[in-house]
């Protein structure tokens, strides 16, 4: 500061510009480093409910290749579902247990879903962009105790009939390529539940209001 007082600022800057330039370069490098460290996180507070009009809106197709923003969001969705199934992490980060999530559930109207189904000997997990059901079985399946949803707080008891087997086409973030997935049973039900969100459909829309617990002798009960 004393030097600035004793000489012309322009002359001072011209003599020492390399110092400023070097400092600016360091600042930029630090910013990029911290930007990579700071990743998007989703908590239960980010989940919108069925009282929010956006949950009933149509989600838009996502342009490929994915932008950094879309990639980060889908990864955050996948991380939410994975972490919600870990009791310690779920409690520490305030996560509701989940097996799937759609982008619209965090207020983003884009065709993206994440599903994670753990088994004793492995896991079925996908993070899909623009998922589309391309074939489905005639046979139905349903969860014996009914379905639930992160965006639904009220009670909606009843059976939700879905296709027992489906094939889904889309881009999978985990494999970083376009895929065709064959799913059956619980995995198929969860995929259909999340894909429904992309058209503004909720699980209780499928429940028969007059006979919510009706059964189907030919359907697979899960």
Language-model regions: role of each:
Residues 27-222:
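Positively charged
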């Amino acid at each position: 500061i004393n030097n600035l007082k004793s000489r012309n600022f322009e002359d001072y800057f011209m003599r020492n510009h390399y110092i400023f330039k070097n400092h600016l370069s360091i600042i930029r490098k630090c910013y990029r480093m911290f930007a990579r460290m700071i990743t998007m996180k989703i908590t239960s507070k980010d989940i919108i409910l069925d009282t929010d009009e956006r949950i009933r809106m149509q989600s838009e197709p996502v342009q490929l290749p994915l932008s950094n923003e879309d990639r980060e969001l889908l990864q955050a969705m996948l991380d939410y579902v994975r972490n919600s199934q870990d009791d310690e992490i779920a409690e520490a980060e305030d996560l509701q247990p989940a097996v799937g999530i759609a982008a619209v559930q965090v207020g983003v109207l884009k065709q993206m879903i994440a599903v994670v189904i753990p088994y004793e000997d492995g896991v079925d997990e996908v993070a899909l962009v623009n998922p589309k059901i391309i074939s489905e079985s005639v046979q139905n399946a349903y969860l014996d105790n009914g379905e639930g949803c992160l965006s639904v707080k009220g009670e909606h008891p009843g059976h939700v009939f879905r296709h027992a087997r489906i094939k889904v086409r889309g881009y999978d973030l985990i494999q970083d390529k376009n895929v065709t997935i064959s799913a059956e049973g619980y995995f198929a039900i969860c995929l259909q539940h999340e894909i429904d969100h992309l058209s503004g459909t909720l699980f209780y829309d499928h429940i028969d209001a007059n006979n919510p617990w009706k059964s189907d002798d030919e359907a697979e009960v899960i």
